[in-house]
Amino acid sequence: MSSEGMSSGGPAAADRALMDVALERASASLAEGGIPVGAALAEDGRLVAAGHNERVQRGDPIAHGEIACLRNAGRQPSYRAMTLYTTLSPCQLCSGAVLLFQIPRVVVGEARSFAGDLDFLTSRGVEVVLLDDERCVALMREFQQRFPQVWSEDIGGR
């Protein structure tokens, strides 16, 4: 697992721009009273789809940000050249989707609020880049303070 956000050059410009898209989706979810996890899917730096967690808004326990993003991408001939950007480390469900669709690279905004399954992904050959983006951390902290009950009934209670 690499921490591009901590290397001398920082993350690539395309990674920053696509994480910005995921962060916009996460902010939209928080504005709706939902869990602020956003995701973007890209191929060769081109945005394919974006989505955000809608578990609270839709009352759907599997409407995670990464799953919503994949749903919004629709049918694709292949995901093998794509990168998934997510503001928060993916859970087991979303990590499973990454493996199912053979997405080779995942860029994670932050893993402080929730560690997720990053080691599981890397053990399966997925390149994981952890940006440790302070904006993603701040958004999750705001959510945890405003909606502690929702956080505890979701991944915060695990």
Report residues per predicted region:
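Short cysteine clusters
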Residues: C69, C91-C94, V98
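A short, polar/charged loop-to-alpha-helix boundary motif
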Residues: E54-A68
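Small-residue (primarily alanine) positions within well-ordered alpha-helices
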Residues: A22, A26-S29, A39, G65, ...
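Short beta-strand scaffold segments in enzyme catalytic cores
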Residues: V37-G45
